[in-house]
């Protein structure tokens, strides 16, 4: 059994990648998971969904090649599918069942209650959730988001203050196949 802490950052045009002040850190720190990155004994494949994401490419078209490459490098393969559509995440879980250790959805910031091991031995969860302010609208100050909905005008997002919650999934595996998955959250 092994333990891997795998923080991911989302797709290129969102979240951390828009923050110019961290670009030099992102360019030099090898611990940061980037799209289609892998490392060590645990390979992490970071894919962006196509539906409602404007990526211009289906993750289904590239994932087979990436899984084949990762199998040669790692004992376990975790797929992070950063996607909006639940259907796309569920389909990817079934498509990769038995070929990867886990398929974990990200992007919607709300932890789902469907963590399970699929029949072929792949741990699956539609969305792991977020690490961010508890009293917020998916991490952003609530007043900004409410005003945006009321006025229908763009607004500069600001991270909310206050207690932080960490959403995560604990996966146990043997021989590259999941034996369990447990969703959890911690208030920090």
Could you say what each language-model-derived stretch is?
Residues 1-188:
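Acidic, metal/ion-coordinating pockets
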């Amino acid at each position: 059994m092994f333990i891997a802490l795998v923080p991911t950052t989302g797709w290129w045009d969102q979240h951390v990648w828009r923050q110019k002040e961290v670009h030099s850190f992102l360019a030099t720190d090898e611990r940061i998971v980037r799209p289609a990155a892998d490392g060590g004994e645990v390979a992490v494949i970071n894919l962006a969904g196509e539906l409602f994401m404007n990526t211009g490419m289906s993750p289904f078209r590239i994932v087979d090649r990436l899984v084949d490459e990762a199998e040669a490098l790692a004992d376990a393969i975790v797929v992070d599918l950063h996607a909006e559509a639940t259907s796309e995440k569920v389909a990817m879980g079934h498509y990769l069942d038995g070929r990867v250790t886990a398929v974990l959805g990200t992007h919607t910031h709300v932890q789902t209650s469907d963590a399970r091991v699929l029949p072929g031995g792949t741990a699956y969860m539609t969305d792991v959730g977020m690490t961010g302010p508890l009293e917020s609208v998916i991490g952003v100050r609530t007043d900004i988001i409410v005003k945006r909905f009321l006025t229908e005008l763009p607004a500069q997002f600001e991270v909310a203050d206050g207690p932080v919650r960490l959403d995560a999934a604990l996966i146990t595996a043997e021989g590259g196949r999941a034996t369990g998955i447990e969703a959890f959250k911690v208030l920090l």
